[in-house]
Amino acid sequence: MAPRTIVKVDLNKPAWEQPNLHNRWHPDIPFAESIDEGETVKIECLDWTGGQIKNDDSAEDIKNVDLTRIHYLSGPFEIKGAEPGDVLVVEIQDVQPLENQPWGYSGIFAKENGGGFLDEHYPKAAKAVFDFEGIFCSSRHIPGVRFPGLIHPGIIGTAPSKEILAEWNRREGALVAENPHSTHVMAQLPNASYAFAGILADEKLSATVASEGARTIPGRPENGGNCDIKNLSRGSKVFLPVHVPGAKLSIGDLHFSQGDGEISFCGAIEMAGSITIKCKILKNGISDLAMKSPMYLPGPVEPHFSPSRYLTFEGFSVDESGKQHYLCTTTAYRQTCLRVIEYFRRFGYNDYQLYLLLSCAPIQGHVAGIVDIPNSCTTIGVPMDIFEFDVSPNGKAKIIDLGSCAFANS
């Protein structure tokens, strides 16, 4: 028997006019639907921008994206029988793009509007559109590359209790207050602009959620959320703590593929799609599992590349100016990314194409060493078989015409 579809989305309608969606974490957002323990259900989701990005050859939409109108999640769902202190086990049975939108996109935000991990080096907005062909994808904006997707939800989480929500706002607010002169946005605090508690919320509740609801941008230890873990694919199980009656599970931000780190921020292959799940409740699971943050079991369905076919680059806690940092994995990983870009630039790609590819292709990022002072060492393995030409390290590269990603017109 086909699973019950509990959320359907309309790609031609604004997200805030559709039922069963919301874009804040708050314990009082009304249930969208109820799910029985052990019931298999299908849930449709908008892409993470709510339809702001188009299938075209300009990055104007990426440059001008409204980051207050994002993460319209499907939910929250009541899981019947779930109570605070339990653990909710969500089995991801399938994830697919919507049949009427067989494409996705990866983007680089402009430094002044969101930025990304390498925005000091690559401040301009850029975009690549990917077409889906069964399990494979390819892009006219990054020619010479084709790979299978590891399709997954970027966001899956439960609602916080009122106490946990207050703690989030306290600690994230303190971080912002402690860094008044930072050149980076330290945290996204509650923001009433385009806050959406769902069409079932009355005016008073909508105002409450707008003023105190947590933004969905970061993942958090108490509920999971936007962790962007590429291995939460078909067949995986994610274990989430329950803090409110019914759990109030929400899901969204579906990805066709993503590299470890999702470094460009809008960096997976973002898509509208559907996810099929089944839930199990572990009573008293938070205590029994000594759980302080979510955990997961990967599924058996992943693209397989021979270990010997990953061309692997190293980076250390020494930045591009030669400054030594102490065991800084952020510096090391940024340097690893730059080493990858420098290598593949030799074949004819521009740096923005490679920045996008690093973010959305099935690369493997690892912390190799974190004890050998003063340097951390991180690695990035790039599967050479995603390329349609030889990229192995055999001397001087042959430069070929590899086109360009999309840029903004202004």
From Swiss-Prot:
Catalytic activity field: formamide + H2O = formate + NH4(+)
Top EC class of this enzyme: hydrolase
Keyword Nucleus carried by entry: yes
Cellular compartment(s): Cytoplasm; Nucleus
Keyword line: Cytoplasm, Hydrolase, Nucleus
GO molecular function: formamidase activity
Superkingdom: Eukaryota
EC number per UniProt: 3.5.1.49
GO CC terms: cytosol; nucleus
Pfam families: FmdA_AmdA
Alphabetical list of InterPro entries matching this protein: FmdA_AmdA, FormamaseFmdA
Tagged with keyword Chloroplast: no
Primary location class: cytoplasm
Subunit and interaction comment: Homotrimer.
Family under the similarity heading: Belongs to the acetamidase/formamidase family.
Protein purpose: Hydrolyzes formamide with the production of ammonia which can be used as a source of nitrogen for growth. May also act on acetamide, propanamide and butanamide.
Protein name: Putative formamidase C869.04
Species annotation: Schizosaccharomyces pombe (strain 972 / ATCC 24843) (Fission yeast)
